[in-house]
């Protein structure tokens, strides 16, 4: 089963973009343990970002400051998530999203509160999005 984890960064920053990452661990699942990006060092995030790039399916979705102004920060976050999922080179069977809201029009999607602590795919997406934004 192709499970994609989705997380975003940038919700607290009204001036910047919202960055969402979608990661499918596939056969790489279980070879390394991912944690919420807020609980890892910049060096570990960089190392894990590179491992994800080399071993997993991934994509990034961006909602610009104009998107945030046009909609609101939550809708812009959902837009970034949908862009990330749509940009994946494979079609996932299940979408697991960090938080309490599922973007409209997403099939087979489930939100998981504290998902970045509980679900490896979401933790990997958290790492990927934060490193991408910070670098």
Language-model segments: which ranges?
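RNase H-like, Mg2+-dependent phosphodiesterase core
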Residues: 1-135
């Amino acid at each position: 089963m192709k499970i994609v984890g989705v997380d975003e960064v940038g919700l607290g920053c009204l001036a910047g973009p919202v960055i969402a990452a979608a990661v499918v661990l596939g056969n790489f699942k279980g070879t390394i343990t991912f944690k919420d990006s807020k609980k890892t060092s910049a060096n570990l995030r960089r190392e894990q970002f590179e491992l994800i790039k080399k071993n997993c399916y991934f994509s990034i979705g961006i909602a610009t400051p104009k998107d945030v102004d046009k909609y609101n920060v939550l809708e812009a976050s959902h837009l970034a998530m949908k862009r990330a999922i749509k940009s994946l080179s494979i079609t996932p069977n299940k979408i697991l999203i960090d938080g309490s809201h599922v973007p409209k029009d997403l099939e087979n999607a489930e939100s998981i509160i504290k998902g970045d602590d509980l679900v490896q795919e979401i933790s990997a997406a958290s790492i990927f999005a934060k490193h991408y934004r910070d670098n």
